[in-house]
């Protein structure tokens, strides 16, 4: 670690800091610090932290300690604006030491990278030597394994030789999880000579290709679709470990020794100490295993100060806050120690703990005084920076800048102060976080006659003009010694802009690659044959050709066959598009093969679906016919409002905003639905749309189902539009009569621009002067008559609907053009996955968890789902945490009382809300980040998923505890549900089943109907497909009627059966995982054009290497199916070893002549519309007949010739020279060479 030296010019606020440090007060400080005194007490306002740290870092390396993790994030971001990459943030674990939860993989990776840079300052691959490390008191007090900085990461470079098996073994050692498809950090997958690795500190996973043991290529790929990202170049990958306690031979041996001494009892409580030690001895990582570090690691523990270079000073910011925080952390850590191990000890035969609880205390936090004493022993000076005065301290000549907090009068005063300051030749700077905001500030200064201009990054302000900079600075300062005034955007607006590190780790979109994961016994729906049960995947050789099939089981076609007798159906892989998983509530009866029951069920469903489609289309037709208002393009004010958004928009959010604006600018009334989980940024889209409408002189109504939501939106809209002349009012049950009248009058005379309210807005007596846009939040929660009212609005004003229930992608596609949809799948940048704990109910643990939340000034939800005993539950919570303010809420309370209670909880008048599942939807309380659910074994998966979505909605880490009674045995389904929720804890979790359940609800919301009977009858996926087909028919009819043409009713697409001697399959040595192989088959079967087939082939090549011959033939068969479907042919079969039969095919006379000329031995039977053609031989007489791709091409040539169309090439060839693909990669053999 070295002194970062003078500020770098390419860092945004470097020049500004350079100017500030020229003040005598800082020059004296640097001189004083140069002597490295053991103690140094400084006094300055909090806004001077950046300058003090920058001054001290000039003299040599420095460790800065803050009271909270958030303060550390912000200070690190500001220091990076001065010193660039010479600054590192050392985050603390999100978990407390004995919480039985392991810290997140990304946290561990970031910590190990910082410690590695401290230990190896010369390692250029990791960046320049560190000059400043910023951390919170939590990391300072937390003991760690000695020599963590010496733990070697795995480094791979293109062109290097690395034994393939050695690399895989090393990844396992570094605690990476092996999976068949990489989806989150800390995972890796192996496929032949290709290795996919998602390192904890990487933005995207990396695909590494080996040729033998040489690394030939590396490229990043996207988690969403598993395709390479060609724009990003990468030559070296540094993969840090995923845990700080690695299961080395020594650690495993020690665990085995302890486990042998105390064998687990027969009925061990999962998670007992014995259970944990037994697993660790086998090398299985367990959640929360870091807690037993003191008993497994014989060399004692180290502190952060032990990892620093000699003589590095520790600068503690706000020492008073740090001391309080340290005491709280130690107390809560202690509670978790007792809670965790008293439960866990019970797993041994004699019921005594295999480890001494006192000894385990060694992995808990160390007292602050002990850390200070240890620092003194190792020669680290201890310096403090306080805001409270002290006689022996050095007081710096720095003042905090005035703050306007968004009040216009105060902003004018600040501008006047700046004018006066620069008029006397002083220096002034205004720092804003975004480029757009910075440009807007220049305009606003100019409007107030204050000379201002933009500065380049790293430039210092000039005298006589306010320099405006884009950079990471939160609070302004006044430095008389440098004649400098610095104001920030926070000082003006009062809104805290988050320290969005330009590059937060990539947010994960919900997986688009959705392997059809089938396990034996799953119900599936076959379009033609109905509901069957999946048995297995088999490979059969027919006529010398190997093919894979799915075996399905159906009810016996014989009457009285009984449940035992079942019929089997072999589905070839090229017909996989006919299959979908059955989702639809209760388990249905299996269909009979060949019976008419399935056809009848489908006909009924189709009839019901037609009605809905007709209604949707007629509404669409009315909208098309009625002229709406075409809004004008964006104004400069619109750009100003959007630049002031305090967060980085996600890709989905930007797309949705663009789509909404494009709709508004068309003359046809908009009808768009925006789907996205609560907290994914739907409100911001509504704010921008509303503002756009107001710019055109139109009024906006925002309709919400509850008073709480109305208040939340009122606050958000008010804050976002505070600097603009827009009148926003609320109208709900809590609005008193006089105010309600005033609002209603304002709507009639046009003085109110935006009104946010509940269904009161829909009552008679509310008149509008010029309503232009209606925003509806959670439409499904309104009553029937309110929905009808909203529907009637749709034909003449723009309507934007927001829904938190996910909507199936397929439905979204089929509604295109009728109800437009935008889906937001990406979580906001700052959100972390919720840490999920599933375990037995234990009062000590609950008390510790609630206290930990109160420690960070947060709030908690406590879910108890029985109204009869909820008051008793609340009383128990009050006993556990007497200092907390506890309140009860449930659906049977009078509505006014319920809303008031939740309102007061939102206003932070209560700490813990003991409630039923009413919190499941729509509640957005960002300060509540701990959720405790009693009797979690009685909830459904989608309920658990929705409940967990209530917490972790801000920059704080969320915690969810799903508890079950320790003495009650869990049912198998309850166990499965809890295991699923425990495993799927990343954001937008891939909880396919729960999401399906929610999607069924979402589909009902959008279609506005109750169709559960039909959904159950045919299964959800097929139902949605029927909706799509019906809509397409109506849409065609509508277009045809508009053009004065007659319309044909669309027929159900027929399945094409191809049964030829073609060895076409995806070999298991090409794609080893059944799940992924099935996905490959399904993608090819579902391709609906040659272009889509080519795209699937590209993707397979990218993910698994060049296609082997059988896979290329499979693609050729997929193309032939498309050609047959386009020609109306449903059956292509090798009738014998010597002939091929095609049907149905009706040939006019000219085509019959052509057929006889091409194949003299061919037969055409007009009565059955069948053509039979001999299969030619590969050479002269006696040679074998053609097969595989040649045969497929022959059939294709025959079809195109008979239709009088040009020949179509069916085979898939490698476009590059043999042995190389388009990227110049060697593809001759994909298997690794020995």
Curated annotation (Swiss-Prot):
Entry-linked Pfam families: CarD_TRCF_RID, DEAD, Helicase_C, TRCF, UvrB_inter
Top-level taxon in the UniProt lineage: Bacteria
GO biological process: regulation of DNA-templated transcription; transcription-coupled nucleotide-excision repair, DNA damage recognition
EC number from the UniProt entry: 3.6.4.-
Classification via SUPFAM superfamilies: CarD-like, P-loop containing nucleoside triphosphate hydrolases, TRCF domain-like
GO molecular function: ATP binding; damaged DNA binding; DNA binding; DNA translocase activity; helicase activity; hydrolase activity; RNA polymerase core enzyme binding
Keyword terms, alphabetized: ATP-binding, Cytoplasm, DNA damage, DNA repair, DNA-binding, Helicase, Hydrolase, Nucleotide-binding
Subcellular location: Cytoplasm
Signal sequence interval, chain numbering: none
Entry keyword annotation includes Protease: no
Region (Disordered): 1207-1234
Helicase ATP-binding domain mapped to chain residues: 663-824
Role according to the record: Couples transcription and DNA repair by recognizing RNA polymerase (RNAP) stalled at DNA lesions. Mediates ATP-dependent release of RNAP and its truncated transcript from the DNA, and recruitment of nucleotide excision repair machinery to the damaged site.
Family as reported in the entry's similarity comment: In the N-terminal section; belongs to the UvrB family. In the C-terminal section; belongs to the helicase family. RecG subfamily.
Record note on quaternary structure: Interacts with the RNA polymerase subunit beta (RpoB).
Name of the protein described by the UniProt record: Transcription-repair-coupling factor
């Amino acid at each position: 670690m070295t002194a970062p030296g003078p500020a770098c010019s390419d860092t945004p606020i470097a020049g500004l800091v350079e100017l500030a440090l020229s003040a005598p007060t800082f020059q004296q400080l640097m001189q004083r610090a140069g002597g490295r005194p053991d103690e140094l007490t400084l006094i300055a306002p909090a806004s001077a932290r950046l300058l003090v740290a920058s001054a001290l870092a000039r003299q040599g390396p420095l460790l800065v300690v803050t009271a909270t993790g958030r303060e550390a994030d912000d200070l690190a971001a500001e220091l990076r604006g001065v010193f660039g990459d010479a600054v590192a943030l050392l985050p603390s674990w999100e978990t407390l030491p004995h919480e039985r939860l392991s810290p997140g993989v990304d946290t561990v990776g970031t910590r190990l990278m910082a410690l590695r840079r401290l230990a190896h300052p010369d390692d250029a691959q990791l960046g320049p030597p560190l000059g400043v490390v910023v951390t919170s008191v939590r990391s300072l007090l937390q003991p760690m394994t000695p020599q963590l900085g010496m733990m070697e990461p795995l480094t791979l470079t293109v062109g290097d030789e690395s034994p393939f098996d050695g690399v895989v073994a090393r990844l396992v050692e570094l605690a990476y999880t092996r999976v068949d498809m990489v989806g989150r950090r800390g995972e890796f997958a192996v496929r032949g000579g290709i290795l996919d690795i998602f390192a904890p500190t990487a933005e995207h996973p990396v695909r590494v290709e080996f040729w033998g043991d040489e690394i030939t290529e590396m490229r990043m790929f996207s988690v969403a679709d598993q395709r390479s990202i060609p724009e990003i170049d990468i030559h070296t990958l540094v993969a840090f470990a995923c845990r700080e306690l690695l299961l080395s031979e020594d650690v495993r041996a020690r665990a085995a020794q302890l486990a042998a001494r105390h064998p687990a009892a027969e009925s061990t409580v999962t998670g007992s100490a014995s259970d944990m030690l037994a697993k660790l001895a086998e090398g299985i990582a367990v959640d929360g295993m870091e807690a037993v570090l003191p008993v497994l690691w014989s060399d004692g523990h180290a502190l952060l100060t032990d990892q620093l270079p000699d003589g590095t000073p520790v600068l503690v910011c706000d020492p008073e806050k740090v001391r309080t925080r340290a005491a709280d952390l130690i107390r809560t850590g202690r509670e978790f120690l007792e809670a965790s191990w008293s439960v866990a000890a019970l797993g041994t035969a004699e019921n005594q703990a295999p480890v001494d609880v006192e000894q385990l205390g060694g992995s808990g936090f160390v007292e602050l005084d002990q850390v200070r004493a240890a620092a003194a022993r190792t020669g680290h000076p201890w310096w403090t920076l306080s805001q409270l005065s002290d006689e022996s301290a050095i007081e710096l000549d720095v003042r905090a800048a005035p703050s306007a907090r968004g009040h216009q009068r105060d902003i004018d005063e600040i501008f006047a102060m700046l004018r006066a300051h620069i008029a006397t030749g002083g220096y002034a700077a205004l720092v804003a976080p975004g480029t757009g905001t910075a440009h807007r500030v220049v305009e606003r200064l100019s409007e107030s006659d204050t000379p201002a201009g933009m500065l380049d990054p790293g430039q210092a302000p000039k005298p006589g003009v306010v320099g405006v900079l884009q950079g990471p600075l939160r609070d302004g300062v006044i430095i008389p010694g440098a004649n400098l005034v610095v104001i920030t955007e926070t000082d003006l607006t009062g809104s805290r802009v988050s320290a969005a590190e330009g590059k937060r780790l990539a947010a994960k979109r919900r997986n688009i690659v959705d392997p059809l994961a089938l396990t034996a016994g799953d119900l599936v729906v076959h379009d033609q044959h109905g509901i069957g049960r999946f048995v297995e995947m088999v490979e059969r050789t027919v006529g010398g050709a190997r093919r894979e099939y799915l075996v399905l089981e159906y009810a016996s076609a014989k009457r009285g066959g009984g449940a035992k007798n079942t019929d089997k159906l072999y589905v070839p892989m090229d017909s996989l598009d006919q299959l979908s998983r059955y989702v639809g509530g209760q388990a249905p009866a299996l269909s009979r093969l060949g019976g008419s029951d399935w056809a009848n069920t489908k006909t009924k469903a189709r009839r019901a679906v037609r009605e809905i489609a007709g209604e949707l289309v007629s509404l669409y037709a009315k909208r098309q016919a009625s002229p709406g208002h075409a809004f004008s393009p964006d104004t400069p004010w619109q750009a100003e409002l959007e630049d002031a958004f305090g967060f980085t928009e996600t890709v989905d959010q930007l797309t949705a905003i663009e789509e909404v604006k494009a709709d508004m600018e068309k003359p046809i009334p908009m009808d768009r639905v925006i789907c996205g989980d609560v907290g994914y940024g739907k409100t911001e889209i509504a704010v921008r749309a509303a503002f756009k409408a107001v710019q055109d002189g139109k009024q906006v109504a925002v309709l919400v189902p509850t008073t709480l939501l109305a208040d939340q939106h009122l606050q958000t809209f008010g804050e976002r539009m505070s600097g603009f002349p827009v009148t926003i009012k609320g109208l709900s049950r809590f609005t008193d009569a006089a105010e309600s009248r005033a609002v209603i009058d304002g709507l009639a005379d046009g003085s109110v621009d935006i009104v946010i309210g509940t269904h009161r807005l829909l009552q008679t007596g509310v008149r509008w002067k010029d309503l232009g846009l209606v925003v509806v939040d959670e439409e499904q929660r309104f009553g029937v008559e309110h929905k009808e009212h909203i529907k009637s609005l749709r034909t003449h004003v723009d309507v934007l609907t927001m829904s938190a229930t996910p909507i199936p992608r397929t439905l979204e596609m089929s509604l295109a053009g009728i109800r437009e949809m935008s889906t937001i799948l990406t979580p906001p940048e700052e959100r972390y996955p919720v840490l999920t704990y599933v375990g037995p109910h234990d009062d000590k643990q609950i008390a510790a968890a609630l206290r930990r939340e109160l420690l960070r000034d947060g709030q908690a939800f406590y879910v108890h789902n029985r109204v009869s005993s909820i008051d008793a539950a609340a009383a128990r919570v009050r006993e556990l945490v007497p200092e907390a303010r506890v309140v009860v809420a449930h659906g049977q309370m009078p509505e006014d009382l319920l809303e008031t209670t939740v309102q007061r909880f939102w206003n932070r008048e209560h700490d813990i809300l003991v409630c039923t599942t009413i919190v499941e939807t729509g509640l957005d309380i960002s300060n509540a980040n701990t959720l405790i659910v009693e009797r979690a074994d009685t909830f459904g998966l989608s309920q658990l998923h929705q409940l967990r979505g209530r917490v972790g909605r801000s920059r704080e880490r969320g915690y969810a505890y799903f508890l079950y009674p320790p003495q009650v045995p869990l049912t198998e389904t309850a166990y499965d549900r809890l295991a699923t929720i425990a495993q799927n804890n990343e954001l937008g979790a891939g909880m396919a089943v729960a999401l399906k359940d929610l999607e069924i609800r979402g589909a009902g919301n959008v279609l506005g109907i109750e169709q559960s009977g039909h959904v159950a009858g045919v299964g959800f996926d097929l139902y949605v497909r029927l909706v799509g087909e019906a809509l397409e028919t109506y849409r065609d009819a509508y277009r045809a009627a508009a053009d004065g043409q007659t319309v044909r009713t669309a027929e159900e697409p027929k399945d094409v059966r191809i049964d030829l001697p073609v060895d076409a399959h995806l070999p298991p040595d090409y794609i080893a995982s059944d799940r992924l192989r099935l996905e490959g088959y399904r993608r090819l079967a579902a391709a609906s054009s040659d272009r889509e087939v080519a795209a699937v082939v590209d993707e397979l090549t990218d993910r698994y290497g060049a296609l082997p011959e059988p896979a290329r033939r499979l693609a050729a068969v997929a193309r032939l199916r498309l050609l047959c479907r386009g020609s109306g042919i449903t059956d292509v079969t090798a009738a014998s070893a010597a002939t091929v039969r095609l049907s149905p095919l009706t040939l006019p006379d000219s085509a019959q002549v052509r057929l006889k000329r091409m194949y003299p031995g061919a037969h055409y039977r007009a009565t059955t519309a069948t053509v039979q053609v001999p299969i030619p031989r590969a050479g002269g007489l006696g040679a074998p007949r053609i097969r595989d791709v040649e045969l497929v091409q022959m059939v294709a040539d025959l079809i195109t010739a008979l239709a009088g169309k040009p020949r179509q090439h069916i085979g898939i060839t490698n476009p590059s020279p043999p042995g190389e693909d388009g990227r110049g990669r060697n593809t001759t053999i994909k298997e690794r060479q020995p």
